[in-house]
């Protein structure tokens, strides 16, 4: 089957987990892993897996533009702001897994979130990918006036990039809650839990609504959970939604697939699984366009 070439920039936890997911794709051919530390575990694993590896960062794409049509950026918000302009000049489709928010926000569980005509899209944050679908579901039936989310992740699953981006995480997730989730006002908090053994990713979503309808909200939440589970099987409700006046609280748990980090790192898994799904939609579109072009030439 025809595949579209891709590269990953960023050989940390997220980039390495994404590498293992891309290996299974039927429409994306991972061609290279790019980092800046030759001793990083991600570059070592990529080399062992047979991928071309580079330790000179974005320069690898500049020097070898044919490496990839789709570039996944798993570096940092600061680095992506520089990468974005370069990759735009090189006409690469960019899927940004940092909180840079350079391109429009994308959450694959939200079907009216059109993005295939964009060159650069942003995957918001791990907390955003877990919670924004629920905010969106509630808003669709009850009009969310305020939404607050608390994402709790194992400290062991948070690499240096995640730790350096805490401020960007809260700002970008807040924006995503409002712009994609539909809440009039949003707030986001992240907690790194050092507990041993490491805990699974847990998310709490608190919404105040204008039009309380417990039955409709309950059904909307369950439908959205099932939709997210189509690409993140470990995504689940920790308990049934709680209702109190005009307020609804939802408790989620995300267990990772264990592709790179152990299953407690659901925060990595939901981010990379969402990025894979978005990348495959872009790849499918590219393949379809190439087929149409060949057919038109044949005519």
Swiss-Prot record:
Class of this enzyme: oxidoreductase
Segments passing through the bilayer: none
Disulfide bonds: none
Stored InterPro entries: Acetaldehyde_dehydrogenase, Acetylaldehyde_DH_C, NAD(P)-bd_dom_sf, Semialdehyde_DH_NAD-bd
CDD domains for the chain: ALDH_C
Keyword check for Oxidoreductase: yes
GO molecular function: acetaldehyde dehydrogenase (acetylating) activity; NAD binding
Keywords of the record: Aromatic hydrocarbons catabolism, NAD, Oxidoreductase
EC number of the protein: 1.2.1.10
Active site residues according to the UniProt entry: 126 (acyl-thioester intermediate)
UniProt record, GO biological process: catabolic process
Record's catalysed reaction(s): acetaldehyde + NAD(+) + CoA = acetyl-CoA + NADH + H(+)
Binding-site residues, NAD(+): 11-14, 157-165, 267
Domain of life from the UniProt record: Bacteria
One Pfam family of this chain: Semialdhyde_dh
Sequence similarity: Belongs to the acetaldehyde dehydrogenase family.
Protein name, as recorded: Acetaldehyde dehydrogenase
Lineage start: Bacteria, Bacillati, Bacillota, Bacilli, Bacillales
């Amino acid at each position: 089957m025809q595949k579209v070439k891709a590269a990953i920039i960023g050989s940390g936890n997220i980039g390495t987990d994404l590498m293992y997911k891309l290996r299974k794709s039927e429409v994306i051919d991972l061609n290279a892993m790019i980092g800046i530390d030759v001793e990083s575990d991600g570059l070592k694993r990529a080399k062992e897996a047979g991928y071309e590896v580079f330790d000179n960062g974005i320069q690898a794409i500049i020097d070898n533009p044919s490496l990839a049509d789709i570039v996944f950026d798993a570096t940092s918000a600061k680095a992506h702001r520089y990468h974005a302009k370069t990759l735009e000049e090189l006409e690469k489709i960019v899927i940004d897994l940092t909180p840079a928010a350079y391109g429009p926000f994308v959450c694959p569980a939200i079907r009216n979130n059109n993005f295939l005509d964009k060159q650069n899209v942003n995957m918001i944050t791990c907390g955003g990918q877990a919670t924004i679908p629920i905010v969106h579901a509630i808003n669709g039936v009850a009009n969310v006036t305020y939404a607050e989310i608390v994402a709790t992740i194992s400290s062991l699953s948070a690499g240096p990039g995640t730790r350096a981006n805490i401020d960007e995480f809260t700002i970008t997730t807040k924006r995503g809650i409002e712009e994609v989730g539909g809440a009039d006002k949003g707030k986001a908090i992240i907690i790194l839990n050092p507990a041993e053994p490491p805990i699974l990713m847990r998310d709490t979503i608190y919404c105040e609504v204008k039009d309380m309808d417990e039955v409709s909200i309950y059904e909307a939440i369950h439908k959205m959970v099932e939709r997210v589970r189509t690409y993140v099987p470990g995504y689940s409700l920790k308990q049934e939604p709680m209702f109190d006046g005009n307020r609804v609280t939802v408790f989620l748990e995300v267990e990772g697939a264990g592709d790179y980090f152990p299953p407690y790192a659901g925060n990595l898994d939901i981010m990379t699984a969402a990025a894979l799904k978005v990348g495959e939609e872009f790849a499918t579109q590219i393949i379809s366009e190439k087929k149409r072009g060949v057919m038109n030439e044949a005519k």
